[in-house]
Regions:
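Gly/Ala-rich beta-loop-alpha elbow adjacent to hydrolase catalytic centers
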Residues: 100-110, 131, 405-414
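Short, surface-exposed "cap/lid" segments of acyl-processing enzymes
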Residues: 15-57, 311-359, 369
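N-terminal cap/lid segment of alpha/beta-hydrolase-fold proteins
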Residues: 1-20, 260-322, 571
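Alpha/beta-hydrolase active-site loop
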Residues: 38, 69-91, 373-396
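Alpha/beta-hydrolase fold nucleophile elbow
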Residues: 92-103, 395-408
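The alpha/beta-hydrolase serine catalytic core
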Residues: 72, 122-222, 226-251, 255, ...
Length: 618
C-alpha cells in the first residue's frame, strides 16, 4: 500500500495489479475511528485477491484538509467519492468498479452512485453496504444517544461547557449544522426510487435492527440484483478498538462476493500472487494548506506511519525550534480521538512548531496487517518504544529539542519514552491515568473498574441519578472502596517517602517516584494536565501527595487542573484549554520565541477555518 492525495483528501492505495477496483467509503466521526481496522482489513484482503483498493479520509476528516466545523461538508464528501472514482478509472486504469461503504459511508456511496448533487452519475458496477445508514434522521438520533450516554457520566462543569458547543458534538467529532440538516433530509429508499441510474448489483450485510429490509425492497423494486446477508458480528464490531474484533465472516462475505463478480483470467490469477507490495517509505505525498504542509512519512526501523506537519516556511533540511511527537490515544488512529491530534498539530504549525503524529505498531496504518485484537497495544512496551523511535527520528532530522505528548495511554507512552531515549527534552501528559502500569494488570480489568476520581465520587454522593445508575448497572463498589483506602494510606506514606528522599533514599525506576526522579535527573521537563475530577489525579495523590502540594519543590514538573477538561478532551472548550497550556509550556520550557505568542492565540488558532483549502473537487 502507498499513501495518496487528491482534492485535499489523504488516503491509501492498495495495488492489486488487475483491472478490478474498489473504493472503501468509511463512516463518520467516532464510527470511522472504531472501524478503521475493519476498513484496512478489507483492503488488505481484496488486494491479496488482485483487486486494486483505495481508502481515504473525506474532506475535513482524518488527515485530510479542512476543519470539521466548516460548511459544505455534505457536498464535499460526495464530491470526494466522485474524485476517487475518476482517479481509479482515469489514472489507475480500473475498468470494473465497486463501492464499499460502512454505516454513513454506505449512505454517501449510494448518494454518489445515484448521481445525487451537481455531479453526473458515475459508472459504478456494484455496491456493498455494511450496516448501512438508510435514514439520516434515525442515524442522528443514534449519535445523539451515544454522546448523551457519555455526557451523563461527566461532571456538571463539563456538561455546562458542552451546552455551549458551536454545533453537534459526538465524542469530540463536530457535525456542523448544515451537515446535520443535509443528513436529516436523506432517506435512501427515496433516493433509490428517484435515481436516474443505480449499480447493477448490491450486497447488503445488515444487523438484526435497522432499515436494511426497507432498502432491500426498494432496490428490488428498481430491478437491482440484491444479495442480503446477516451481520451477526455487528455487536463486537462497532466498539472502540480495545474491545472490538474484526468481523471475519462479514469480511469473507464481502471479499468473496466481489472476487466472484470479477472476471478470472490466467493473468489476473498470477497477479493475485504479487498484489499490494509493501510501501517502501518513500513519499511524495504532501498536503499544502496555505500556512502549513503535511506529509505522510515512514518513521524509524519499524516504518511507523506518521504525518509530519510543518509550518509552510520551514524546510526539513533546516529545522529550527522544537518538534512535538503526538502519540496515539488508546487504539485511535493518528488523527486522534475526536480529531484532537490534527487540531493540535495544525494549531502548533500556525505558530511555527513542527509536529509528528504517529501510529504505533498495531494501531491505524502501522504494522504489517490490521490487528484483530488491539487490546494488547495500549500501555505496551512496544508502544513506548515506538514513541521513543519517533523522537529519535525527529532528532536525526536536526530538531534541537523534541517533546512528546499524548492523552491517557498516549500520555503514558510519551512519559516512558522520555525515560528510554535522550532525544526527548520534555513531556506533556494529558490525563495520565497511571505513572506505572502494574505487571499482570489487564486493560479489560481496568475498564471494568471505576471511571471517576475519589473526589468525583464524593461529589456524586448527593446526586440521586448517580445512585440510580449504580443500582441499575449493578456496579461494583469495591474498586471505589479500594481507591478511598489507597488515598488514606497515601496521607502517611507520601510524607515518609519525601523525608526518605531527603536523606538519600532512591526509588526504583519501575515506580512512579522513580520515573519522575529519572526524568528530573536528566533535566527533562514535564507538564501534567488533568481534568479537575479525572481519575488520574488519584494516582498523583497516592504517590506524590495532595494535588495542591504535589511537585511543589520540583523545578521540572508543573501540574494543571481544569474543570472543563474531560478525560478524552472531547469538548471544544477543553480542547482550547489543553492546546493553550501546551503552547504556554513550549514557550516557557523550550525558549522558542514564535511560540511565546501562542498563549493569546491558541483558542482562535485551534478553531480557525481552512477556508483557503478546497474541500471539493480540484
Amino acid at each position: 500500500m502507498k499513501p495518496i492525495t487528491f482534492g485535499g483528501c489523504v488516503g491509501w492505495l492498495h495495488e492489486g495489479q488487475t483491472r478490478q477496483g474498489v473504493i472503501l467509503c468509511e463512516s463518520l466521526g467516532h464510527e470511522a475511528s472504531w472501524t478503521h481496522k475493519l476498513v484496512r482489513a478489507i483492503a488488505e484482503r481484496l488486494a491479496r485477491e488482485g483487486v486494486t483498493v483505495m481508502r481515504f479520509n473525506y474532506p475535513c476528516t482524518g488527515d485530510s484538509a479542512g476543519d470539521d466545523r466548516e460548511a459544505g461538508r455534505h457536498a464535499a464528501t460526495i464530491g470526494s467519492i466522485h474524485d476517487a472514482i475518476d482517479l481509479l478509472r482515469d489514472e489507475i486504469g480500473v475498468t470494473g468498479l465497486t463501492l464499499v461503504g460502512i454505516r454513513a459511508g454506505a449512505l454517501f456511496a449510494m448518494l454518489a452512485a445515484a448521481g445525487v448533487g451537481p455531479h453526473p452519475p458515475p459508472r459504478v458496477d456494484a455496491l456493498v453496504a455494511l450496516a448501512p445508514v438508510v435514514r439520516g434522521r434515525a442515524y442522528l438520533r443514534e449519535l445523539s444517544f451515544v454522546h448523551r450516554q457519555w455526557l451523563d457520566t461527566t461532571s456538571p462543569a463539563i456538561r455546562a461547557a458542552h451546552r455551549d458547543e458551536p454545533c453537534m458534538n459526538v465524542l469530540g467529532h463536530r457535525i456542523p449544522n448544515d451537515l446535520v440538516d443535509a443528513l436529516k433530509a436523506v432517506d435512501l429508499c427515496d433516493v433509490v426510487r428517484d435515481a436516474p441510474t443505480l449499480p447493477g448489483a448490491m450486497l447488503l450485510i445488515q444487523p438484526d435492527q435497522g432499515d436494511g429490509p426497507a432498502l432491500h425492497d426498494a432496490l428490488l423494486g428498481r430491478g437491482v440484483n440484491v444479495t442480503s446477508e446477516p451481520f451477526r458480528e455487528w455487536p463486537t464490531t462497532m466498539l472502540d478498538g480495545t474491545r472490538s474484533r474484526l468481523p471475519l465472516t462479514a469480511i469473507d462475505t464481502v471479499v468473496n462476493w466481489i472476487v466472484e463478480r470479477s472476471p478470472s483470467t490466467p493473468a489476473a490469477d498470477e497477479a493475485r500472487l504479487h498484489a499490494d507490495p509493501a510501501w517502501n517509505g518513500e513519499s511524495a505525498v504532501a498536503l499544502d494548506m496555505n500556512d502549513m504542509t503535511e506529509q505522510v512519512v515512514a518513521v524509524g526501523p519499524a516504518r511507523l506511519v506518521g504525518v509530519l506537519c510543518r509550518p509552510a516556511d520551514t524546510r526539513p533540511a533546516e529545522p529550527v525550534g522544537p518538534a512535538v511527537v503526538i502519540a496515539n490515544t488508546s487504539t485511535n488512529p493518528r488523527s486522534g480521538e475526536g480529531r484532537f491530534s490534527v487540531r493540535f498539530a495544525r494549531a502548533l504549525a500556525r505558530v511555527g512548531v513542527t509536529t509528528l503524529r504517529i501510529d504505533v505498531q498495531g494501531v491505524g496504518d502501522s504494522g504489517r496487517v490490521a490487528l484483530d485484537d488491539q487490546s494488547g497495544v495500549v500501555y505496551s512496551t512496544q508502544s513506548v518504544d515506538d514513541v521513543a523511535a519517533a523522537a529519535d527520528w525527529l532528532r536525526a532530522l536536526g530538531y534541537p529539542e523534541v517533546v512528546a505528548t499524548g492523552i491517557c495511554s498516549g500520555a503514558y507512552a510519551a512519559l516512558h519514552a522520555a525515560v528510554k531515549t535522550p532525544s526527548l527534552g520534555g513531556v506533556i501528559a494529558v490525563n495520565l491515568a497511571r505513572f506505572v502500569w502494574p505487571a499482570g494488570l489487564s486493560l479489560e480489568a481496568v475498564q471494568k473498574q471505576r471511571n471517576n476520581s475519589v473526589r468525583g465520587y464524593w461529589l456524586s454522593v448527593r446526586d440521586w441519578r448517580k445512585w440510580k445508575r449504580f443500582v441499575l448497572e449493578r456496579r461494583d463498589f469495591r474498586p471505589i472502596v479500594r481507591a478511598v483506602a489507597a488515598n488514606a494510606v497515601a496521607r502517611v506514606s507520601v510524607p515518609v517517602m519525601e523525608i526518605a528522599a531527603r536523606v538519600g533514599w532512591k526509588p526504583r525506576i519501575d515506580t512512579p517516584r522513580g520515573v519522575m526522579r529519572e526524568l528530573a535527573q536528566r533535566n527533562v521537563w514535564t507538564m501534567l494536565v488533568y481534568g479537575a475530577l479525572d481519575p488520574g489525579i488519584d494516582d498523583v495523590r497516592r504517590h506524590f501527595g495532595a494535588i495542591e502540594h504535589a511537585f511543589r519543590r520540583s523545578r521540572h514538573v508543573r501540574l494543571h487542573l481544569d474543570a472543563q477538561v474531560d478525560h478524552a478532551v472531547y469538548g471544544a472548550v477543553g480542547t482550547d484549554v489543553v492546546i493553550d497550556l501546551c503552547m504556554q509550556a513550549l514557550a516557557r520550557e523550550s525558549d522558542w520565541p514564535v511560540a511565546r505568542v501562542a498563549a493569546q492565540a491558541a483558542p482562535e488558532a485551534a478553531g480557525q477555518s481552512y477556508a483557503g483549502v478546497s474541500v471539493g473537487r480540484s
